[in-house]
């Protein structure tokens, strides 16, 4: 084969507080980008607090994920991701791929369409993490194909986000959202002023409602999250124009928080109770809003602090642990810790890896994946950044390691281009 090792960009995310409805049937599952509640925080406990010099035990590694930036969805003993030019196929097209969680064996691969070959070589490839719901899974290709598959790989329906829904991207890097499943609805972000957000029947793909945000620049790369404000369910999302809140029942645009035009808006928002934190890179920074109920099921957003460049994050994502935010400074490989309510930086430190860092959290620790292939473990504390282990991921270093890590059931799962690796991190 063909494609050297690639991993994840244009994806990001994070929330804390509200669960995503109807995305998993198993108790132990990671059914969409950044997990069941889209927090990037795993419920796992009893994990290693330090790693050996060469890293935790490698349980298995497998090939056949293809070129791509997508992370992993894990449900009912199966792992799903998106990639193109798989080492297990004889073409360069894009596929949704399924692996056995226990062994890493590839179970099936179903074609979605053409590969994404636009832009710099290291920015090409697949990028949307699948969303799994019961016996179905949903993917968005970079070209804007929204496809529903059965979990055995059979295609059920597809919609073209650009052609069918008038979608528009705010940049030239393709679509990468992981769609939201909420009850019977699939909710996605076509982007643009006509159909900024859309809700579809998850079983048939039929359009239920769309939301228009005047002069919206187009979809970014975030995956939306859910809030509940005074009895009103709100879908919170960011586009190329900034943050927005949409009433879940009918798609009514409730509020917007506009930002200046920037290169790309990638990280997903963080929701805790009535608070919304969102951030973007390229000098934009992070802001904190409070959602306030008004009347007749409407909600407004009030600014607690404005976009603060010190809180900027390009694509590695930010996690909220207790009352502090943790993320990479832009894409510099310099993790930061900040107070959620004030935005004040508590610490900022260089880690053992280099370049951009994506992270997840579990059991009071940060799992920091630097794009040069270094995987690090650090305690999630406002006191200081101190690593208690790091290792070089096999096969890394040829291209950026951008796929977000997943911690589930005592294991650390990493996507490294065509390879998926499983590590035992249980403290037993």
Tell what function each PLM region has.
Residues 1-7:
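N-terminal secretory signal peptides that target proteins for export/translocation
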Residues 7-21:
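Bacterial N-terminal signal peptides
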Residues 23-428:
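Noncatalytic, solvent-exposed loop/strand surfaces
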């Amino acid at each position: 084969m063909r494609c050297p090792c690639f991993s994840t960009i244009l994806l990001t995310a994070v929330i804390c507080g509200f669960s995503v409805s109807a995305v998993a049937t198993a108790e132990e599952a990671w059914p969409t980008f950044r997990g069941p509640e889209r927090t990037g925080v795993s419920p796992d406990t009893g994990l290693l607090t330090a790693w050996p010099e060469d890293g935790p035990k490698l349980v298995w590694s497998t090939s056949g994920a293809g070129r791509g930036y997508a992370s992993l969805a894990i449900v009912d003993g199966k792992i799903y991701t998106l990639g193109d030019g798989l080492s297990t196929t004889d073409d360069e097209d894009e596929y949704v791929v399924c692996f056995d969680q226990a062994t890493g064996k590839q179970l099936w691969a179903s074609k979605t369409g053409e590969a994404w070959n636009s832009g710099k070589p290291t920015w090409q490839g697949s990028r949307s993490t699948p969303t799994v719901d019961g016996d179905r899974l949903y993917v968005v290709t970079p070209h804007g194909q929204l496809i529903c598959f059965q979990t055995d790989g059979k295609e059920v329906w597809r919609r073209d986000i650009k052609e069918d829904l008038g979608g528009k991207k705010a940049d030239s890097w393709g679509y990468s959202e992981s769609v939201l499943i909420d009850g019977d609805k699939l909710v996605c972000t076509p982007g643009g002023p006509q159909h900024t957000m859309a809700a579809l029947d998850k079983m048939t793909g039929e359009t239920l409602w769309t939301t228009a945000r005047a002069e919206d620049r187009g979809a970014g790369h975030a995956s939306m999250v859910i809030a509940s404000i005074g009895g009103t369910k709100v879908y919170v999302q960011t586009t190329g124009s900034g943050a927005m809140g949409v009433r879940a029942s009918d798609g009514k645009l409730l509020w917007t928080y506009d930002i200046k035009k920037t290169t790309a808006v990638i990280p997903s928002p963080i929701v805790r109770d009535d608070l919304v934190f969102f951030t973007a890179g390229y000098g934009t920074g992070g802001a904190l809003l409070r959602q306030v109920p008004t009347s007749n099921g409407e909600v407004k957003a009030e600014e607690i602090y404005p976009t603060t460049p010190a809180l900027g994050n390009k694509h590695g994502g930010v996690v909220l642990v207790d009352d502090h935010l943790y993320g990479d400074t832009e894409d510099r490989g310099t993790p930061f810790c900040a107070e959620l309510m004030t935005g004040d930086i508590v610490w900022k430190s260089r880690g053992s890896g280099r370049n951009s860092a994506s992270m997840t959290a579990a059991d009071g620790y940060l799992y920091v994946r630097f794009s040069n292939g270094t995987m690090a473990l650090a305690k999630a504390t406002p006191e200081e950044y101190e690593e208690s282990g790091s290792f070089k991921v096999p096969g890394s270093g040829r291209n950026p390691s951008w796929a977000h890590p997943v911690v589930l059931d005592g294991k650390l799962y990493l996507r490294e281009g065509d390879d998926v690796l499983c590590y035992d991190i249980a403290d037993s």
